[in-house]
Amino acid sequence: NLNDNSNVREEASTVFSWTHDRLRPDQLQWLGSLPKVIQTDNFMVIHSSCQPYPNCTYVTSANRAALHFLFQKTDLCFNAHSHVPLLAMHRPGHQLTMKYFHNLILPRNVQVMIGVGAVGQPRDDDPRAAAILYNTTANSATLLRVKYDVEAAKKRILDAGLPASLASRLTLGK
């Protein structure tokens, strides 16, 4: 719900309100109409975890990944909420695996969740933008890192009157 920021930290609430106040009603309506889940035969794309709202959460631990996998309907799922590029793999009867990765041929008969990282607000000690390139033919995923003008981005944050901690996070990558 684009009008409900009651369940977020104060810093996030400030940014949420700032952004909301700058969007036109038609833009808010369009954002509200977007699907919460994009699902194909082969993969799904979500914001946080596959757990139903409001229980969805950051997938940052094996316990949280295990909960996520209870609701994942495809072998492969991409998510972004944690802002950390990571890989979680689940095969029934085996220990759940979580790790960082750069290049990976995705295994068959295993559920895989890939955290795609972030463009801005990184949380993995690396200020560069992160994205995942998924090759459907090779069934592979590659982590891409791109430098951008962090100082200019920090200046825009501060000039907008947003919390200074948001600007410093860009340099620190946390």
What do these predicted ranges mean?
Residues 47-50, 82, 145-147:
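Short, structured patches in soluble enzyme cores that scaffold and shape functional sites
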Residues 46, 76-81, 113-117:
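Active-site neighborhood of phospho(di)ester-bond hydrolases with catalytic His/Asp-centered motifs
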Residues 92-174:
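Acidic, His/Gly-rich catalytic cores of divalent-metal-dependent hydrolytic chemistry
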Residues 1-73:
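Active-site neighborhood of divalent metal-dependent phosphoester bond hydrolases
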Residues 63-95:
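Hydrophobic, aromatic-enriched interface-forming segments
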Residues 1, 51-53, 78-90, 105, ...:
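Active-site environment of divalent metal-dependent phosphoester hydrolases
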Residues 37-40, 85-89, 130-134:
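Short beta-strand scaffold segments in enzyme catalytic cores
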Residues 2-5, 59-60, 91-94, 128-130:
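Short, glycine/charged-enriched secondary-structure capping and boundary segments
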